[in-house]
Amino acid sequence: MSLFLISKSQPSLSVQAKRLVAMRFLIYTGFQTSYFIGVIGTLTYADGASVVATSLAVLFMNVFVILGSFAGGAALDAWGPRRHFLLSIVGTLATGASIIAFGSATGTALAGAVLLGFVMGFAQPIATSYPAYLTDDPVELKDINSAITMFSNVSIIVGPTLGGFVAAAASSRAVFVLMMLFTLLALIAGWGFKPQEVRVAGRENADSAEEGERASQANRPNPSTSARATFAASIKTVFTNSVLALLFCIIFLSNFGYGAFDPLESFFYRDVLHVGVEWMGWLSSASGVGAVLGAVLALRLPPHLVNLKTLLVALMSVGLGSLLYVGTPYVGVALVGQVALGIAWGVVNPLHNTIVQTTAPLEQLGRVNSVMGFGNMFAGVAPLAIAPWLAATFGVQRTLVGAGLVVTAVPAALLLFGRRHLDRAVKQ
């Protein structure tokens, strides 16, 4: 069914690209049913936990998303997309079953954050790296990435909406059953996924050439000098390439303020907006509606606008949308803010992924994306140390408004004062 809908809405994509979009849509919908409601919602509403507990949950999740993304990138580079996808499916099913089996106590919710974070990170290359195994054409990559982003954002509508209804009818923990169901559907959609043979052969040839070069410098085989690029080489690739290095810094600095949102949003709903746990799903769905519109906008961007400057404008719009979202105590205004926020994110994600995929070497792409993801997630981890103190000192809403100001100010400052570096990177 999802393949049929994708075929109708994206007729220009190849069959394998449509299958990839369906794979990402289904597994990501499963994640979206569960994270916000199943972990943060359980802690806030069912357990009555403190801001410290929700901050710990977000910290654990972000740390293990980072670890999972490194593991997933390594698995992709070593074994290719098909085996990586199967491991993602098995890990997600095992996580859902474990969380359901062990109850909803605070300790279990925190352990669930660890497991869920790891499998979400492990599965990230499906969206960030798989497209490069289908084509190396920049325009086609932009179209695939925009379609993935658009349907990922449909996931942000469908997943939290269904999760909200399940939480209202049963419990916040029951959403993990939905996650497992969508994961099984993703397995069905991805069963016939086949990367382009030329692309896979090219990756293997690059690995073989590197292996030959290293073998000529050694008397015997050494696993530490494997043919495959190490993480150290991927880190070097990021920071010796002007575009990738600047992109890493942009995403890190722009997301630094956003890290305060995750542990405090549920308290904003409960104590400022005065709504129930189901609204955590429904307001997230509003963001998904906006993100679909943003992805459609990204799909229509001309090639000359697929660059770092456009990305900064989109990131600044994320900050402005977040200010509208948390700036008042009215749920209607928060709804509009979530739509605006979603539109901005819908443009950011395909731009970011396309820039990375057209810049990084394919044989290192999985781990280069892991390095980029590390910067993104670490930026979200750092504010968690002070989020509870800020909320206790200034209040939840004021802290969120301050975070929104940071998210807005960083890309604005980079646009105003970093134009020379941006121009140099764009020319290269």
Predicted regions and their residues:
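Helix-loop junctions on the cytosolic side of multi-pass membrane transporters
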Residues: 182-207, 416-427
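Cytoplasmic membrane-interface "Motif A"-like loop-to-helix N-cap segments
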Residues: 78-89, 303-315
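Helix-loop junctions at membrane interfaces in 12-TM secondary transporters
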Residues: 101-113, 326-337
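Helix-loop boundary and gating motifs at the non-cytosolic
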Residues: 2-63, 241-285
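Transmembrane alpha-helix termini and helix-breaking/packing motifs in multi-pass membrane transporters
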Residues: 38-46, 158-179, 271-272, 382-400
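Juxtamembrane intracellular "pre-TM" segments in multi-pass secondary transporters
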Residues: 1-17, 196-248
